[in-house]
């Protein structure tokens, strides 16, 4: 009898491929057997596999649309015991709207050209979002708030962003005790597109108002349905005129700053309401997610999971459960400077922000746009 010759061992680099081929054959055999015994179950399994694959591809695509910033997050510190201070929030989302004119809606001229505005981006809108088990708190901080470790080192929050988002995060931490856990940025054009994606916003204005510098023109008081461009003009209005007794009256710098903070909160609440309404349809919700991820910047440690968690809070919160707080800080003598007052610190402390409760991460990281 002729003795069978032993086959030569397969090369090491081919062994994984061989195992894959064996696995594929095994899967085919099992699927074929399942098809014979459970044809309906087989079809459902294939459909589910396709759906999972599509969802994963969609998640990757959505994540890739976000602009990323490298931010060194501050750390909480024990801090001093302050009477009336609330507990430090579990999460603080820092929302910054910038004044970038690079892609200004309806043409740059309406908002001033980049050359007229100067180099860099300033923080035009600054808000702190605190998700709560029973709702959401939004604290609107005046962009003119001027803070620092000494008189000669004070900076306006708006101007701190010229050195990059890290500078703003660290300044809020060291001087106000704000421990930022997540950062979201949006420029003027992005803000307008988000409002339009939400179907516009419904707001109430107490008197006719206009502002040539921001393009605001609301000739009638009462309920208003605003497009993205008009909502942007409202939250950016700094030198408004209101019509009283048939005449247009210019408001003071202090009144203009107070109205700006107020309507920032009003519009943010209205945007949340609009997003909630638009998200009721799965198809519209997907389109909305696509629009949002393409118009937001986030810190590099915030992924889609964190954004989805925030979205669930926003979309699951009724308008009555959204608390909007205007942090007080009056401007000085019709200037662009507002120093914190005892009332400023008291309001912030009520929501868990106390100087000394936050430790900055370290050296400033500059603009820090991630690749």
Annotate each PLM feature.
Residues 2-371:
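Non-catalytic, solvent-exposed segments at the cell envelope interface
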């Amino acid at each position: 009898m002729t003795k069978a010759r032993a086959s030569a061992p397969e090369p090491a680099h081919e062994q994984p491929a061989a195992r894959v081929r064996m696995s594929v054959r095994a899967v085919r055999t099992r699927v074929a057997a399942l098809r014979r015994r459970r044809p309906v179950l087989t079809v459902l399994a294939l459909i589910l596999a396709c759906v999972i694959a599509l969802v994963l591809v969609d998640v990757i695509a959505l994540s890739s649309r976000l602009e990323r910033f490298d931010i060194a997050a501050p750390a909480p510190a024990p801090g001093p015991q302050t009477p009336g201070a609330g507990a430090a929030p579990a999460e603080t989302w820092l929302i910054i709207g910038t004044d970038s004119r690079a892609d200004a809606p309806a043409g740059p001229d309406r908002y001033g050209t980049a050359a007229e505005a100067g180099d860099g981006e300033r923080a035009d809108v600054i808000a702190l979002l605190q998700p709560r088990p029973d709702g959401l708190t939004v604290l609107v901080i005046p962009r003119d708030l001027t803070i620092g470790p000494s008189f000669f080192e004070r900076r306006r929050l708006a101007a701190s962003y010229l050195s990059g988002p890290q500078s703003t995060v660290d300044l809020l931490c060291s001087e106000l005790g704000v421990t930022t856990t997540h950062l979201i940025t949006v420029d003027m054009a992005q803000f307008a597109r988000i409002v339009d994606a939400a179907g516009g916003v419904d707001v109430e204005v107490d008197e006719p108002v206009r502002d040539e510098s921001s393009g605001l023109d609301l000739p009638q008081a009462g309920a208003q349905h605003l497009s993205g461009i008009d909502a942007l003009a409202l939250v950016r209005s700094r030198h408004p005129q209101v019509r009283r007794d048939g005449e247009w009256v210019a408001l003071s710098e202090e009144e203009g700053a107070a109205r700006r903070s107020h309507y920032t909160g009003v519009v943010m609440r209205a945007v949340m309401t609009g997003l909630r309404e638009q998200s009721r349809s799965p198809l519209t919700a997907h389109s909305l997610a696509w629009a949002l991820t393409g118009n937001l910047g986030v810190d590099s440690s915030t992924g889609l999971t964190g954004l989805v968690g925030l979205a669930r809070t926003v979309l699951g919160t009724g308008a009555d459960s959204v608390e909007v707080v205007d942090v007080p800080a009056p401007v000085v003598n019709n200037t662009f400077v507002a120093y914190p007052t005892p009332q400023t610190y008291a309001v912030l402390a009520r929501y868990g922000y106390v100087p000394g409760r936050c430790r900055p991460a370290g050296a400033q990281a500059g603009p820090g746009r991630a690749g």
